[in-house]
Amino acid sequence: MSLAPWDIAICMHDIEFFTWRRTMLSRFQEMASAEDVFQELQFQTQKLEFDYYSLCVRHPVPFTRPKVAYYSTYPEAWVSYYQQHNFLAIDPVLKPENFSQGHLLWDDALFSEAQPLWDAARAHGLRRGVTQYLMLSNRALGFLSLSRMSAREGPIAHDELELKLQLLVRESLNVLARLQHEMVMTPAMRFSKRETEILRWTAEGKTSAEIAMILSISENTVNFHQKNMQKKFNAPQ
């Protein structure tokens, strides 16, 4: 039984994808520097017919102002404008509630509560975009965002684009983790021996008075160390 033309096209498309996948996995395994990762991402961004990309990691600490690290090929004018207007605070792409979707297309609905950001992005030539999310082993959130200056739909189907972005963000961050790049490493939080003891008993649900009795210190000393730890966590006091 012969295959119909469209069946042949589907088979060829699948073969091309898995060939690309094998090539990419091999390439990422051979990377020896962060620059290798960043250059490959730009190359793949253009192959997918986008213009710019941003690789971002949002760490879970400090709790009230989580550390955000990124590498971007966006125009410097846009990066400066974004920072000057503190768009980080309203960017829906970075909101944890959107992370569960995994694959996020940029559209009017997504930016409905961040209209100034959406208007400014388009004014700077960023008219279409997509973001792929990934949870890292240290509970940090990884984001790979691609954008283009053209408002037209890209030639690549959304399901294929999603599969490729899943691989790109996963392998990129895996390489950076292997290299122990600062972008993916959890911010260091150093505690004294006494602070560690108090933190452990606090996690057990003990009150300041109970911890004071257990450690044979005053309750004021316990409260003093707890306030110091709150500052390190950047948590509200």
Positions of the model-derived regions?
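The N-cap/first-turn positions of alpha helices
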Residues: R194-I198
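Recognition helix of helix-turn-helix DNA-binding domains
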Residues: T207-Q237
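Regulatory sensory and allosteric helical modules in signal-transduction proteins
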Residues: S72-R122
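GAF sensory/regulatory domain recognition
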Residues: V57-S80
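Juxtadomain coupling helices with adjacent low-complexity linkers
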Residues: S2-S26, A34, R148-S192
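Short amphipathic alpha-helical segments
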Residues: R22-S26, A34-Q46, W118
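Sensory-domain boundary capping and coupling elements
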Residues: M135-S150
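Helix-to-coil/beta transition segments that act as allosteric "coupling" elements at the rims
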Residues: L117-R139
